[in-house]
């Protein structure tokens, strides 16, 4: 039983498969209001959305790999995983009433932890309480504050948020990623987009945001056997990569005549970029979001990071690819979170949930993540609303 000084939290002390390394601590130290900085908030976590990128890090690195106290003082490494969540505000920092009056105690919010707290201090979201910066939080406003009804027809409860806490838990980092990468592509109506990994949680959000930019045509998706699901969120065409191997040869054969105006890879398949010249238009951008193909070891992760850094720098005369390349990681902020929520409120964006697991079953949730067969977000219910 947790108290105000302790809480339930999943922790890990070594690298490896999360389903094998995490341990449930029923008396983990709880953050408190006394620890809050001026722009921070204490949140009671209801749901946590798992992230494949964090799973890759957990498999490759021990917790807090860059924490100097642990290096020099040889303190025990201990980390709480994950960073995307939804919940209820318990307490606010001293600056919040004047800078963010929309964030008050008892307000329902979605957001993510600061990178420093997660990756350096080991204080992630898979716990009953967490501290998060105001810049990476946004309230779930009731429908009555964001929409109006012009007719007498029955509609949604105006006192209800436009999205549930459960669905909202996966919208902060992934939603910001979808909006920000579409901004990077500079796509306009009539352009042609290719998304690899359309059945990933971020892939399905990208498809929906792209639909608002490109209109009825233009989004081509590579996925497995999930064509119905992918089309339901707005894809115009779905390529079954399991039946078209190698995928880059299929793209060269069928799309060289009208190349793509942007390619977004949610998986991290290097060959898609190294062979993309015929099917990605000159001057257009290849964006990689994924690390699912990285070897799950320290050196494998180091090699992946090195390759991401070198890909755009390698000269064409030495075998480089004459197309722009960028590895992108979400930068959640208030402005982008606001854009995400406006899309949700207009019914133009929804989170596809693969499965929901109770807090005690987080190991099973990680097994689902490790299978790489999830179709949408994997959610852990930390505590009841």
UniProtKB/Swiss-Prot annotation:
EC number(s) recorded for this UniProt protein: 1.-.-.-
SUPFAM superfamilies: GroES-like, NAD(P)-binding Rossmann-fold domains
Superkingdom of origin organism: Eukaryota
GO cellular component: mitochondrion
Broad enzyme group: oxidoreductase
Induction, per UniProt: Expression is positively regulated by the oxaleimides biosynthesis cluster-specific transcription factor poxB.
Pathway: Secondary metabolite biosynthesis
Protein keywords: NADP, Nucleotide-binding, Oxidoreductase
Binding sites annotated in the UniProt record for substrate: 156-163, 309-313
GO terms assigned for molecular function: nucleotide binding; oxidoreductase activity
Amino-acid positions noted as binding NADP(+) in the UniProt annotation, renumbered to this chain: 64-67, 199-202, 223-226, 241, 289-290, 372-373
Family in the record: Belongs to the zinc-containing alcohol dehydrogenase family.
Complex and partners: Monomer.
Function: Trans-enoyl reductase; part of the gene cluster that mediates the biosynthesis of oxaleimides, cytotoxic compounds containing an unusual disubstituted succinimide moiety. The first step of the pathway is provided by the HR-PKS poxF that serves in a new mode of collaborative biosynthesis with the PKS-NRPS poxE, by providing the olefin containing amino acid substrate via the synthesis of an ACP-bound dec-4-enoate.
Identification of the protein by name: Trans-enoyl reductase poxH
């Amino acid at each position: 039983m947790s108290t105000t000084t302790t809480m339930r939290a999943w922790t890990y002390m070594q690298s490896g498969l999360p389903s094998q390394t995490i341990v449930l601590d029923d008396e983990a130290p709880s953050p408190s209001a006394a620890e809050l900085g001026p722009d921070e908030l204490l949140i009671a976590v209801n749901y946590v959305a798992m992230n494949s990128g964090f799973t890759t890090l957990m498999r490759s690195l021990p917790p807090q790999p860059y924490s100097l106290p642990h290096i020099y003082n040889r303190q025990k490494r201990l980390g709480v995983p994950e960073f995307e969540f939804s919940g209820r505000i318990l307490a606010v920092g001293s600056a919040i009433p004047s800078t963010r009056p929309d964030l008050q105690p008892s307000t329902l919010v979605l957001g993510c932890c600061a990178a420093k707290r997660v990756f350096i201090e080991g204080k992630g979201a898979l716990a009953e309480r967490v501290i998060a910066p105001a810049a990476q939080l946004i309230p779930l406003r009731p429908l009555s504050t964001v929409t109006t009804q012009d007719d007498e027809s029955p509609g949604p409860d105006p006192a209800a948020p436009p999205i549930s806490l459960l669905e909202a838990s996966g919208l902060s980092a992934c939603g910001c990623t979808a909006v920000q990468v579409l901004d990077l592509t500079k796509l306009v109506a009539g352009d042609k987009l290719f998304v690899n990994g359309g059945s990933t949680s971020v892939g399905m959000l990208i498809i929906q945001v792209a639909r608002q930019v490109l209109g009825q045509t233009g989004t081509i998706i590579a996925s497995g056997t999930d064509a119905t699901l992918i089309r339901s969120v707005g894809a115009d065409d779905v390529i079954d990569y399991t039946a078209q191997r190698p995928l880059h040869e299929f793209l060269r054969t069928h799309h060289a005549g009208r190349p793509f105006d942007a390619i977004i890879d949610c998986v991290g398949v290097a060959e898609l970029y190294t062979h993309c010249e015929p099917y990605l238009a000159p001057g257009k951008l290849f964006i990689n979001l994924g690390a699912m193909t990285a070897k799950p070891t320290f050196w494998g992760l180091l090699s992946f990071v090195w390759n991401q850094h070198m890909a755009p720098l390698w000269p064409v005369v030495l075998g480089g690819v004459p197309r722009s390349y960028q590895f992108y990681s979400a930068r959640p902020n208030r402005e982008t979170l606001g854009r995400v929520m406006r899309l949700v409120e207009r019914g133009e964006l929804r989170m596809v949930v693969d499965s929901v697991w109770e807090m005690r079953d987080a190991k099973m949730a990680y097994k689902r993540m490790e299978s790489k067969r999830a179709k949408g977000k994997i959610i852990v219910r930390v505590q009841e609303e």
